[in-house]
């Protein structure tokens, strides 16, 4: 017979919460590789003016999961509350396969359109590239509309395409880019250089004017910031994920100052955007799966000023407060 494992009784009514260790965002923002400090403003943290709040879960666990192991094998350890059941996981994988099939098919057709119009774009609209961004919006909308619902709030806070700005948002998932492209704004993303090597997608990014960045390379970071400043001065907008990477646990990480130094130097507003739900649909590390659900995009009022540290702090506070309001965590 199998062995029934019963959890060891705790010495107190409720076990004390375990303090969370430093997140990947803290490590990247604070020390770079092996503790080496970065030398450019892109890697500098911005302070959080709000007092640190320790949040408790919405509910307390009243029982522990027990596992029955057949054939005398024992299964130990607590179950992960975010684990997807096998049947639901299979459905998510199938949805993921169809999502990439639709995305790839649409990308091939629309990439041809981008190539056709590119000479005219370089001639008449080299910096904003509105025609290319319009095609990208169609592509993202086609890819998304069949798989998850989008809800927008605060669209009136978006400046017109003719007004340059620095956009910033929290980063939860691979789906963030698709979602943001549906806004139809001509902002230039910053992406790892390796992504440009992906057929069709990488080539389309080049046509859109996406800015390449070699991570852990201080010279590349400095060149990236200089290019962003130049683009903004020429009337284009830029988009940053100030955390520098996707959140592994869904909590908002530390912001770096690079985006806000660009805004401070050029005098353009910062447009904070909060993304809700993308990390649940396609969590980091599970890019082959696509869960069902919806995504909400909240565009906040512009933040203006000439002090990069204050811009960073104010923009992060707006996004952090919104995430907390909707039940998300903040580091």
Predicted regions and their residues:
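N-terminal chloroplast transit peptides
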Residues: 1-50
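Non-catalytic C-terminal accessory region of glycerolipid acyltransferases
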Residues: 2-17, 50-86, 90, 222-331
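Membrane-anchoring hydrophobic helices of lipid-metabolizing enzymes
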Residues: 64-165
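Catalytic core of membrane glycerolipid acyltransferases/transacylases, capturing the structured
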Residues: 111-137, 145-146, 160-218
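A generic structural signal for well-ordered alpha-helical segments
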Residues: 143-145, 205, 231, 263
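Hydrophobic beta-strand scaffold residues
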Residues: 150-151, 212, 238, 270
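Residues at the C-termini of beta-strands that transition into short coil/loop
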Residues: 156, 193, 214, 274, ...
